[in-house]
Amino acid sequence: MLACAVLVTGCGGRTEKRSPAPPRPELFGPGPRYRPPAFGRAVERARSVRELRCTRSRPARFLAHVEIFVDGRVVLMPAGIGIAPQHVRRGAFVVSGRCDYPLRTREPTGLVEVAPSPRLTLGDLFAVWGQPLSSRRVLSFRGPVMAFVGRGRVAGDPRRIELRPHLVVTVEVGRYVPPHFPYVFPPGLPTVRP
């Protein structure tokens, strides 16, 4: 009898208001602006970009990671940046092309393979990509550009960020996305062999 009384009072008339669940963020932005092509005209024709040449030499490279957010949404960094077409693909990966620049992406994850010499910057990566980057613009998006290395904000021109081994760079326009847990690089891979 006591158990029934407890159950009845537990189901009583008091209703609890629940706040609505927060909206789920959209992972990737909509449309082609959030999925830019892997190369511009210079790379398509294997021409020099900022004195960076497309060559068949395959030096060992180190890895850096670059993420781009616009209004809180991910911009897909394509496979094939810095690899002149015709691309040889294996699924989403670009395995090879006519020649390679000192900066390249083989997978659509933001993982950038960087030749150790000369010292290369985020501006060099965007130049090879054929996409604009400044303190007021990234790709086709305009507005104040925030750049982070790891979790620390970088003041000044984002093009000047020097790419170093295992550096994690985040570039944002619009709604702020707090830098999250650092990118975990594959263990034992300080450099990438050709």
Can you name each region flagged by the protein language model?
Residues 1-9:
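Sec-dependent bacterial lipoprotein signal peptides
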